């Protein structure tokens, strides 16, 4: 990654100097097909014309380009020597005129890491598929540009592609001619027929949201129509794309249903017509992210096309992502942050709007439960790491930006906005959004621009709110204090607010406090509720004085604010015995989340949390909450349980999961969820034999359909425990000879309990760049099996020896995958903590982004050790 960075100061200096009028980009991707020549990276031709102005004639600047070679550069008609002006990442531009035209002819490399123009060869049929992914700064891998969000411009794309391909971009395109000419690119040499696709000019947009998708994609079309109050009609062509091999699984009608519901919702609430013409959505292979909001051409990871039976939680997650990306058309694409400091201006809003519209426009009316249970768990974890930061972050450069697509920017920011809606009111919030769009359309903004419109519409001082919620880090804890009078009623109920020592800010919270009692039939139901503004260290909720004594007090009932919920002794005792009796699903989700935070904070023994899951998860009606409980229970056992209790706890989890699997309604999504969890927990010989029997048909559980995806889920534990060998996995790949099948097989192969297997997997990921991003991810996932701690122990020193080299030599995406994924978290001992500290002490000059990843992993390890100590103490006292 050397030489590829761009600092905020450099970007500000360039933005003050230049303004861009237009881009014309011509790509020739006919070289994507054909055999590799083996002579260097496979490349494509990229010719870019940029027209721009300079307000200081005679000044110097630079354009961005990451390419193996540059053929020609001309500036204002003057030919420049590429060897003199191009250094591998920048093109020097000297003696600029007031009006300038830059033309760059380059050979750019196809990507195998999901950064830039990614090339994928489908193992099922040999077809080649291309797509681009840029955020935050990888469009410079495809064409020369000024790679920063505040130098917006209209774009015209022209693409030469193989004759039988279709090409898509941000604008409407058409095939205008056939061509047959020599290909100068490396990779697919000779002459090749093709078609030229030309696309309509875009509105002014940032470089990182331009997009090209090309290949023999399967396409389904539809349309959306809207008539506004003034009689104007808006028609939006809709498209949905996937690989041909996935067409039989593609439920495009559901994608279009959610898309139309979202467009209706946002038009109703934003009062600004969708501004980018068409709306295509491509589900693409080997995608690093969930999705990307390229205007008119949204890209998604193809795992959102389901090859087998999934739960409604998966459909809800897909709908949420569709709506999240759609919200970006306004928050992020129409109005864009000036620099990555204000990334939250788009991501927090899109995350909030995804759930807001999900609940308001689709069949997934319990979306706020998922938000409280899953999204906020991500935020709470991120906000307690040493790398936590304010929602408005200090982003010094592009490496900082890459790492700040995190739980703070997304989920905490969205939680803060949910709190803001409670603070200023929904009407004022949405009116502020409408003014924001109209005032800053096709422009760039900072935090102050948003605060200005919210002050106008709410009449409140947003400065103080922003200082507390957007410009400080950390999460507060809220705990109820209940004093009962002689008559057994509440004499005083107060909410106590605490902050971490490192971030002592006490914030204003709008909260609901709920009181719950057990009914005669054992249900735990709310009988009183009061909303109040919490400020300072202690706030008395006077409205609840005189109420009957509660069995449970739930601060932040209805999930209005962002905080860690704590319990008084009575409430915690009630939950230990009666959590399953909570009738309200959101209240249950909030209590489960709070109990998980207590476990992570070493305030609740891991064995107690596992016990609660075993006792009450079978009664959980919300499938998304149930699947989250499964993940938390596994994490509690693997990371937070005392080592001496792991075997006992693991056996209990497997037995409990199997019992629930057998009791679940045949064919239900709960049965499917318990089947997957049982596979995760299985380790005893009898459990592994059952999985094997379910695969070969000698065992059967009524209603459980063991489809291909479930087969792979069963095969991984069989491989990890030495039951499924290479021959078995090869036979399964022959049965499922697809891109998905290959990823599953690679993961299972790396999971096998052999020193030679681990050495081979390590070499493929750490010492070689032969694998694509998706196969790197699969190999890492298979490598680290919780049942193989001793086998993996030798890789602790090798990890610390390798990571700086990997970070320097590989792309930032692969570097992040390796540094995060191979950290020796399973070697959870003080010695590993010391080794981590030793590396940090010896590498104070390492890249800040790399140090951040190691510091985060260290914090997770230290937290795990504290949790294990808490759990061990509980075991000792119980003994």
Predicted regions and their residues:
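Hydrophobic alpha-helical and helix-loop surface patches within well-folded domains
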Residues: 199, 227-233, 237-504, 628, ...
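Extended, low-hydrophobicity, Ser/Thr/Pro/Gly-biased non-transmembrane segments
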Residues: 107-225, 394, 584-593
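Long, ordered, helix-rich scaffold segments
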Residues: 487-492, 503-506, 521-525, 542-879
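A surface-exposed beta-strand-loop module
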Residues: 55, 61, 65-124, 147, ...
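N-terminal, polar/Ser/Thr-rich
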Residues: 1-45, 123-129, 149, 463-464
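Aromatic/His-enriched, Gly/Pro-containing loop or helix-boundary segments
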Residues: 60, 79-97, 133, 137-140, ...
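Beta-strand-rich binding/interaction modules
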Residues: 69-76, 462-463, 475-556
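Surface-exposed beta-strand/loop patches in extracellular or lumenal glycoproteins
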Residues: 49-67, 156-162, 448, 493-514
């Amino acid at each position: 990654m050397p030489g590829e960075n761009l600092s905020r100061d450099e970007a500000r200096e360039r933005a003050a100097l230049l303004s861009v009028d237009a881009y014309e980009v011509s790509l020739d991707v006919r070289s994507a097909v054909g055999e590799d020549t083996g002579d260097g990276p496979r490349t494509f031709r990229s010719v870019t014309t940029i027209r721009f102005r300079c307000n200081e004639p005679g000044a110097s600047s630079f354009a961005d380009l990451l390419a193996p070679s540059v053929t020609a550069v001309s500036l204002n008609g003057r030919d420049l020597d590429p060897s003199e002006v191009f250094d591998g990442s920048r093109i020097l531009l000297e003696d600029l005129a007031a009006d300038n035209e830059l033309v760059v002819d380059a050979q750019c490399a196809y990507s195998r890491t999901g950064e830039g123009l990614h090339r994928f060869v489908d193992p099922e049929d040999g077809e080649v598929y291309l797509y681009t992914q840029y955020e935050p700064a990888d469009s410079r891998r495809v064409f020369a540009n000024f790679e920063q969000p505040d130098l917006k411009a209209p774009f015209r794309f022209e693409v030469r592609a193989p004759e039988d391909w279709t090409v898509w971009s941000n604008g409407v395109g058409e095939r205008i001619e056939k061509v047959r000419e020599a290909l100068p690119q490396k990779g697919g040499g000779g002459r090749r027929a093709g078609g030229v696709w030309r696309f309509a000019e875009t509105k002014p947009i940032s470089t990182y949201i331009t997009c090209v998708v090309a290949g023999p994609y399967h396409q389904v079309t539809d349309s959306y129509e809207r008539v506004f109050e003034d009689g104007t009609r808006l028609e939006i062509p809709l498209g949905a794309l996937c690989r041909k091999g996935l067409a039989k699984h593609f439920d495009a009608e559901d994608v279009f249903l959610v898309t139309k519901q979202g467009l209706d919702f946002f038009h109703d609430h934003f009062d600004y017509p969708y501004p980018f013409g068409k709306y295509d959505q491509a589900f693409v292979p080997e995608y690093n992210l969930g999705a990307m909001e390229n205007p008119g051409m949204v890209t998604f990871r193809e795992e959102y096309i389901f090859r087998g039976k999934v739960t409604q939680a998966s459909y809800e997650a897909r709908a949420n992502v569709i709506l999240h990306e759609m919200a970006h058309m306004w928050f992020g694409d129409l109005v864009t942050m000036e620099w990555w400091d204000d990334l939250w201006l788009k991501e927090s809003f899109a995350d909030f709007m995804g759930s807001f519209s999900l609940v308001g426009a689709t069949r997934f009316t319990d979306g706020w439960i998922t938000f409280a249970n899953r999204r906020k768990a991500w935020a709470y974890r991120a906000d307690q790491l040493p790398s936590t930061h304010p929602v408005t972050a200090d982003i010094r450069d592009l490496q900082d930006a890459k790492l700040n697509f995190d739980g703070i920017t997304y989920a905490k920011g969205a939680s803060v906005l949910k709190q803001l809606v409670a603070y200023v009111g929904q009407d004022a919030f949405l009116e502020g959004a409408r003014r924001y769009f109209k005032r800053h359309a096709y422009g760039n903004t900072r935090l102050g621009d948003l605060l200005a419109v919210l002050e106008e519409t709410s009449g409140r001082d947003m400065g103080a709110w922003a200082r507390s919620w957007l410009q400080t880090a950390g999460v507060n804890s809220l705990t109820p204090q209940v004093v009962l009078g002689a008559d057994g009623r509440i004499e005083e109920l107060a909410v106590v607010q605490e902050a971490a020592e490192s971030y002592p800010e006490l914030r204003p919270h709008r909260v609901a406090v709920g009181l719950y009692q057990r009914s005669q039939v054992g249900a735990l139901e709310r009988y009183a509720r009061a909303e109040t503004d919490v400020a300072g260290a202690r706030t008395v909720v006077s409205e609840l004085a005189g109420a009957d004594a509660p069995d449970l007090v739930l601060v932040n009932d209805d999930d209005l604010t962002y905080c860690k919920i704590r319990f008084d002794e009575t409430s915690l005792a009630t939950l230990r015995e009666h959590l399953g009796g909570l009738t309200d699903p959101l209240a249950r989700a909030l209590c489960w989340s709070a109990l998980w935070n207590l476990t992570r904070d070493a305030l609740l023994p891991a064995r107690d949390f596992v016990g609660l899951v075993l006792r009450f998860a079978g009664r959980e009606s919300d499938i998304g909450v149930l699947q989250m409980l499964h993940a938390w229970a596994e994490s509690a056992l693997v990371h937070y349980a005392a080592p001496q209790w792991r075997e006992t706890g693991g056996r209990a989890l497997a037995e409990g999961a199997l019992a629930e699997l057998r009791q679940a309604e045949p064919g239900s999504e709960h049965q499917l969820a318990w089947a997957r969890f049982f596979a995760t927990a299985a380790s005893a010989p009898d459990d592994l034999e059952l999985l094997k029997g379910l695969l070969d048909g000698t065992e059967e559980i009524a209603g459980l359909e063991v489809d291909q995806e479930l087969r792979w889920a069963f095969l991984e534990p069989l491989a990890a425990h030495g039951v499924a060998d290479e021959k078995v996995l090869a036979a399964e790949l022959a049965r499922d000879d697809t891109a998905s099948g290959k990823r599953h097989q690679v993961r299972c192969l790396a999971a096998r309990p052999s020193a030679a297997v681990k050495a081979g997997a390590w070499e493929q990921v750490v010492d070689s760049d032969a694998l694509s991003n998706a196969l790197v991810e699969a190999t890492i996932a298979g490598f680290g099996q919780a049942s193989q701690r001793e086998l993996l122990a030798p890789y602790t020193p090798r990890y610390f020896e390798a990571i700086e080299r990997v970070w320097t030599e590989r792309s930032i995406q692969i570097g992040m995958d390796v540094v995060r994924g191979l950290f020796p978290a399973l070697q959870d001992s003080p010695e590993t903590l010391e080794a981590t500290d030793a590396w940090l002490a010896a590498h104070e000059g390492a890249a800040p982004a790399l140090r951040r990843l190691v510091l985060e992993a260290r914090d997770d390890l230290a937290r795990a050790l504290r949790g294990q100590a808490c759990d061990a103490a509980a075991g000792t006292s119980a003994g």
